[in-house]
Design a protein with these regions (language model features):
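Hydrophobic alpha-helical membrane-insertion segments
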Residues: 13-23, 81-105, 210-228
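Hydrophobic core of alpha-helical transmembrane segments in multi-pass integral membrane proteins
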Residues: 14-25, 52-58, 86-90, 257-277
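Alpha-helical transmembrane segments in multi-pass membrane proteins
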Residues: 22-63, 77-88, 109-119
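Juxtamembrane helix-loop-helix connectors linking adjacent transmembrane helices
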Residues: 38, 71-150
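Transmembrane alpha-helical segments in integral membrane proteins
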Residues: 51-64, 139-167, 266-279
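Membrane-interface helix/loop boundary segments of multi-pass membrane proteins
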Residues: 154-180, 207-214
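Functionally important transmembrane alpha-helices
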Residues: 186-190, 194-249
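C-terminal membrane module of polytopic membrane proteins
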Residues: 223-287
């Protein structure tokens, strides 16, 4: 058996605790009659984020393997700024996909799955609304750490730094590795009505890792994406956009078509520039 396939089996075994947590949350029926207000929001945020530390367990399978070097320190400040810009433009470009994915209607023979998917989406949305309905600025800061920084680090560490790299070592095809790991990244969240936006987001993070050779850029992009979503919700909650403005926790802002088209053009220009910049930086450091 190929040694990298053996690594994949070991990685999968060590990932079982995480997989079981995700699957149990998906199949367990949430009692919506119990108000979330009886639980302390800060404790829920911290406990949920600490559970993500389990995502580092598969590192034991490859910790002595130089093929999995993630090059945390090999980054430049200017590139990080451009990654911020690229991620922001992606959020705008991704908004029509979010709207389309939420409106998907299944054929009759999949009606049971559709009912289940909508129920889970509704339950998770209620939970998310409670978690991000911060009572004060301190809770908002805890939310940034629990929802943006910790998931950004540990999810990228596993899905891009370990799984994507392993798929590449097996297939020797970067594109296959990026798309397959992004598929797993999106599927394991067990939220169909956010599957495709999360898939494309994972693909973006995968290419950032591939071009740069450093997992830091993917982590920064992931954390910024979550930070932006939490901050927009908090700002709307505080009335910074006006009292009449309402923003759904999983709904993108209603953007005019011209804004989306302009954002797409800027996104394509920026991603080309970022790709060249990261590839050049990687070549300089290797040379």
């Amino acid at each position: 058996m190929n040694k990298h396939v053996k690594e994949l089996l070991y990685i999968s075994l060590l990932s079982l605790p995480v997989i079981l947590i995700f699957l149990s949350s998906a199949v367990t029926e949430i009692d919506t009659e119990i108000p979330y207000e009886i639980f302390d929001r800060k404790i829920m945020l911290i406990s949920n984020s600490l559970a993500l530390v389990l995502l580092a367990l598969p590192y034991r399978a490859i910790r002595k393997n130089t093929n999995y070097n993630m090059n945390f320190k090999k980054v430049s400040l200017s590139s990080i700024v451009f990654v911020f810009i690229l991620t922001f433009l992606f959020v705008l470009v991704d908004s029509p996909i979010v709207i389309w994915n939420k409106s998907v209607v299944f054929p009759e023979f999949l009606s049971s799955f559709e009912t289940w998917a909508k129920l889970k989406e509704s339950q998770l949305e209620e939970l998310t609304i409670y978690l991000v309905s911060f009572d004060n600025f301190n809770e908002y800061l805890i939310g940034i750490i629990a929802i943006a920084i910790i998931p950004g680090f540990f999810e990228e560490f596993l899905f891009r730094g370990i799984i994507q790299k392993n798929f590449y070592l097996i297939s020797r095809n970067h594109h296959l590795a990026i798309w397959l790991s992004a598929f797993i990244f999106s599927a394991i969240h067990m939220q169909f009505y956010g599957f495709f936006p999360r898939l494309f987001m994972g693909v973006l993070f995968g290419y950032l890792f591939h071009w740069s050779g450093s997992i830091t850029y993917a982590m920064v992009a992931h954390a910024f994406n979550n930070f932006f979503a939490v901050t927009m919700w908090y700002a709307a909650q505080q009335g910074y956009f006006g009292k009449e403005y309402e923003l759904g926790v999983n709904d993108p802002p209603d953007l005019p078509v011209v804004v989306i088209i302009l954002s797409l053009i800027l996104f394509l220009i920026t991603i080309y520039f970022v790709r060249q910049k990261l590839l050049n930086e990687r070549a300089d450091k290797m040379g």
